[in-house]
Amino acid sequence: MSTPTPPSSGRPKQPFPSSPGSSRRSKILGILVAIIAIAIFIVPVVVSTYTDFAWFRSVDYQGVFMNVIVTRLVLFVVFGLIGALISWLAAFLAYRARPDEIESLGTSSPLAEYRPLIRRNMRPFLVGIPLFVGVITGMIVQSNWRSVLLFLNGSNFGVHDPQFDKDLGFYAFNLPFLQMLVSTFSVLLILAFVINGIGHYLLGSITTGNPRVGEKASISTNARRQLAVIAGVWMLLKAVGYWFDRYGLLTRSHETFTGASYTDINAVLPAQIVLLVISIFVAAMFFVTIVLRDLRIPALAVALMVGSSLTVGLAWPAMLEQFSVNPNRAEKEREYIARNIEATRYAYGIGDDKVTYDRDWGASGDAASKEQKKAVADDSATLSNVRLLDPEVLTPTFTQQQQLRNFYGFPDELAIDRYEVDGKMRDFVVAARELNPNTLDGNQNDWINRHTVYTHGNGFVAAPSRKVDEVARDVGSARGGYPVYTVADLQSMQSGKQGGELKLDVKQPRIYFGPVIASSNQNNSDYAIVGNTEGEPLEYDTDASNYTYTGTGGVDVSNYFNRLMFSAHFESMNMLLTDRIGEGSKILYERDPRERVHKVAPWLTTDSKTYPIVIDGRVKWVVDGYTTLNNLPYSERIGLTDSTADAINPDGVSETQVVDNEVGYIRNSVKAVVDAYDGSVDLYAFDEADPVLKAWRGAFPGVVKPRSEISKELEDHLRYPEDMFKVQRELIAKYHVSDPGVFFQNDSFWSVPTDPTAPQDRQDNAQPPYYVVAADPETNKPSFQLITPFRGLRREFLAAHMSVGSDPDNYGKINVRVLPTGTQTLGPNQAQDTMMSSDEIARERTLLKGTNDLTNGNLLTLPVGDGQILYVEPVYSQRSGQDSAFPKLLRVLVSYNGQVGYAPTIAEALDQVGIKTSSTTDIQEIDGSVVDPTKDGGSGNKGDKGKDADKDKKSKDEQSSDAKGAAGKSDDKGTDTAPEQRVRDAMDKVNKTRESGTFEEFGKALDELDKAVQDLQSER
C-alpha cells in the first residue's frame, strides 16, 4: 500500500531527524574506522621504532638511533610547521581579503552560485591544506638529515677550489644544505602563490569577467598586493639560487672532463650574475606593484627575465661554444682539464702522494735471454707464493669436504687472507662454516627447528692457496688436487688438533653471525631465538650435544611485551605461543655483518666483500666502510654500482649498502669488525685525516674508535678493500695522464680487460682484481697485494700493471708499472687464447670433456724478474653429470714470453717455458701421504703432516707410477682390458716425448693417444 505524498507547502523540505539508533551506529562505525586506521598506520610505526631501538640498545649503539631519530623529528616538526604556516598564511590572507558584498561580483561567473557555500565552509580548507603541505614538507626535509648533520659538524679540508678560492668544506658541508633551503622555500612560495591565487578566485577577489555581458576581469587591491609580495620574495630566492648555482658550475659534467669549462667560466658564470641582478630588479618591480596598480610593470619585468634567460643564459654560451671553443677546444679547455686531473686525483686518493708510476717498466732486457730467465727464476718472493686455489671455484669442494652436515655451508665466493707460517707470510683461502638456512631439509624447516635448534655454524676453515694434498696426474683418480685444510671447530677443539700449521687457538668457534646465515630465501625469517636457560639446551651443537647461547648480543624476549612486539615485527604468531622462549631468551637478527655495520653507521657505504679472521681466540668479520660525497669541485663523478661490477660480481655493490651511488669523493675511512659469536660491532677510524669522517665523528661522538685502538693482531689481517680498488683502477685508467693536451686526445687511456676465464654469459664483464702474495715493487720482499692489469684503449696488449699493498708497512701504497709505449706484451685475453690454442692443451681438453667438466681458474698476471710478465692459471676438473662431484686442481697453465707451460705442478709448468726456478721446493704442491679430508672428525686437518711434506713426498716417477691413467678404468682386481692398457701406454709415451722428444715425436704420440681413446670408447 503506497503512502500518499503530502502537498507541497512551497517551503524547503526539512531533513528527517536522526534516530538514536543511527547515531549510535555512526559512533561505532567511526570508532572502528579509527581502530583500523591506527592498526594500519600507527601500529607498524610503533612496532618498527620499538624493535629498532631494542636492536640498537643490544649492540650498544642506541646513541646513533636517538641522534638520527631526534634530528629527523626536529627537521620534520620545524619544516613541517614552516610549510604549514606559509600555506596557512596564503589561504588565510586570501580569506581575510574577501569582498564583503557577494552580489557586487556579478552573476556570470560559474562560481557565483557556489561562493556563499564556499565562504561558509572555508575552515576545512584553512586547516586541511596547511596540514597536508606541512606533513609533506616535513617528510621531504627530514630525509635530508645527513646534509643537516654534515652542515652542523663539518670543518675545512685545507684545500681550496681553483675558481672561487673557497675551501672544499664549503662544497662538501655547507652548499648542499643551503641549496636544500633555497629549493624548499622556493617550492613553498610557489605553493603559497597557487593557494593564495585560487583562494582569491574562489572567494571573489579575482574574477575572470564575461565580455558577452559586459563584465571585465578584475583583481582586488588586497589580492594584487598579496600575490605581488609572494612573487617578489620568490624572485629574491631565485637570485639567491643564481648565486649558489655559480658554485654548481664546478661540478658540471662534460664529454671529456668534469668541472667548469671555458664556456662555463666565460659565458655561463657572467650570465648567472646578470640574471641574478635582473631577478632582484624583477622582485623590486613586484614590490612596486604594492603601491602602483599597474600590473604591466611586473609583467614587463618578467618578460625581461625570460628574454634575458634565453639570450644571456642560453644563446650567448651556445654561440661562444660553437664559434670560439669548438674550433680550439684542446687549447681552450687545457686549464680546466688540468683542474679536473688534480681534483680527481685528490678526491679518490690517487695523487702523487699515493701512487707511484714506474714508467717504461721492463724496457731493458730480452725476456728470452738467459739473464732475464735467471732473474725470473730467482724471483722467489713471487714464484714461491703463486696462488693455485681459486676462491671463486672451490666453494663446492669446501662444501663437500668440510660441510659436516647438510645445514652448514660456505659463501659462493671464498675469501683470501694471509697468515704467518714458520716465519713466512702465506696466503690462505679462508671461510667460516656457517649455518645455511636455505639447505635445511624436511622437518628441519619446521619453525621450532629453523629458529631455535639450527641457530649457528661451527668453525673456521683455511687452506694454503699454493698447494694441494697430492699431485693429480690422473684425472680419473679420486686422489689428489684437493686443498689441505686447517680447521678450528668444535670437533678439533675436542680432539686437541685445532689450528694445524696456522696454530690457530679459537676458543669460541660457534658462528651466529655471517653473510650465509643471513641469506635466507624466506622473507622476514632471518632470526634465531637462543639463550633459554630453563631446562635442557636446545640448540644443535654436535651430534652428541646441544648448546645454549651465552653471548651478550641479542634482544631480550623473555618478557611477554617484547615477544608481542617481535611477533608483530616478524609476523609470526609462533613466537607468542611457543614454549621454547623462557628466562634468558634472546632474539638474534640482522645477522649479515655488512648490514649490521651499515645500520649502526648509516652514513657509511660498506664494501661488497667481508671476510673472516681469527683474532683474540674468536672468529670475526672485517667490513670496510667508506665515507663519500656526492660531488666535489672538478672531481669526476663515478657510479659505485657500475664501477664495482666485474665478472665475479656482475651487479656491483648493492645499492642498499651505499649512501651515494654517484660519488665525487671517497675514502676508506673506517674498518669495522663484527664478532661472529655475539654480533658486537666495533668501528675504527682508519683515515683519521678524512674531513668527512671528522664531521661524522662530530655528529656521532664516541661511535668510531680512534685508530690507535686497532690491535697489532687485527692490523695484520686488514686488507685493501676491493671496491675501493676497483673505483681507483677505473679512474687511474684515465687519470694516469698528467698532460691536459694528451688527456684531451684520449689516446693514452687504458682500460680494464674483460675476464677470459669467466662463464660465457659474463665474459664481457671486467676481470676482477686478485689478492696475491708477491714481491713488493720497492723491497722485492713477499707482500700481500691486490693486483690488476690494464690493456690499451681498444687494444688487447698489456699496457700497465697496478698493485696496492695491504701489509701494515706498505698499506695503501699504489704502484703502477707502465710498459713502454709500442711494446706488444700479451694481454690477459691474448695469453688465454695462446694457452687454449696449444695443441697439447686442446687435445687433452677434448679427451677429458666427455667425462669431466673442466673449469679455468683465475688468470693471474704477475710481474716477475726485471720487467717480465708471467701468466698463471689453474685448471680444475670434476666428473660430469654427478651431483656429488666437486672441483680439484688438475693442471697448471703458465704463459711466459709467448711460450706455454701445461703440467700437473707449477714447477713443471714453469720448467716448460724455460724458467728453472730455485723455488721449486717451496712451490711443490705435494703434502705427503694422502688422507681422506672427510674423515678425522670431519676436520680433514693435515697441518701436522704438512710440516714434513718435503721429507715425505714421493718423487715424480713414484707419483706417476701410482696414478691411474687419464682415461683408464680400473676394475675391482686392478687389471685393465687391452684398450685400456693401450691408452695407458699411449699416455706414457706422451709424457716421455713431452719431456725429451722432438715436436714430431710428441705429435705422433698424441695421435696414438687419440686413436687409443677412440678405440676404448668404441668398445664401451
From Swiss-Prot:
It is found in: Cell membrane. Residues 1-23, 924-998 are annotated as: Disordered. GO terms for cellular component: extracellular region; plasma membrane. Residues 942-961, 969-998 have a biased composition (Basic and acidic residues). Residues 1-18 have a biased composition (Pro residues). Belongs to the UPF0182 family. PANTHER family: UPF0182 PROTEIN SLL1060 (PTHR39344:SF1). This is UPF0182 protein jk1603. It comes from Corynebacterium jeikeium (strain K411). The lineage of its organism: Bacteria, Bacillati, Actinomycetota, Actinomycetes, Mycobacteriales.
